[in-house]
From Swiss-Prot:
Function: Apoprotein for the two 4Fe-4S centers FA and FB of photosystem I (PSI); essential for photochemical activity. FB is the terminal electron acceptor of PSI, donating electrons to ferredoxin. The C-terminus interacts with PsaA/B/D and helps assemble the protein into the PSI complex. Required for binding of PsaD and PsaE to PSI. PSI is a plastocyanin/cytochrome c6-ferredoxin oxidoreductase, converting photonic excitation into a charge separation, which transfers an electron from the donor P700 chlorophyll pair to the spectroscopically characterized acceptors A0, A1, FX, FA and FB in turn.
Co-factor(s): [4Fe-4S] cluster
Gene this protein is translated from: psaC
Identification of the protein by name: Photosystem I iron-sulfur center
Keyword line: 4Fe-4S, Chloroplast, Electron transport, Iron, Iron-sulfur, Membrane, Metal-binding, Oxidoreductase, Photosynthesis, Photosystem I, Plastid, Repeat, Thylakoid, Transport
């Protein structure tokens, strides 16, 4: 079952989600939108097991990284209108 990993622009570049991921789905990439000059990226979503450890590790008030399990709809991802 495939899962979708979405990174929001509230990411502060702390790397907590990257370090928490047991399957190395996430990595940091350069980004000028935050003080750390980097943002999480999810280039290997096919390896996501849906454990949501990245979500648990995120220190921001609004989770900057979210895992949408294969059974969740596009509406829950905010893509439907």
């Amino acid at each position: 079952m495939s899962h979708t990993v979405k990174i929001y622009d509230t990411c502060i570049g702390c790397t907590q989600c990257v370090r928490a991921c047991p399957t190395d789905v996430l990595e940091m990439v350069p980004w000028d939108g935050c003080k750390a000059s980097q943002i999480a990226s999810a280039p290997r979503t096919e390896d996501c097991v849906g454990c949501k450890r990245c979500e648990s590790a995120c220190p921001t008030d609004f989770l900057s990284v979210r895992v949408y399990l294969g059974s969740e709809t596009t509406r829950s991802m905010g893509l439907a209108y």
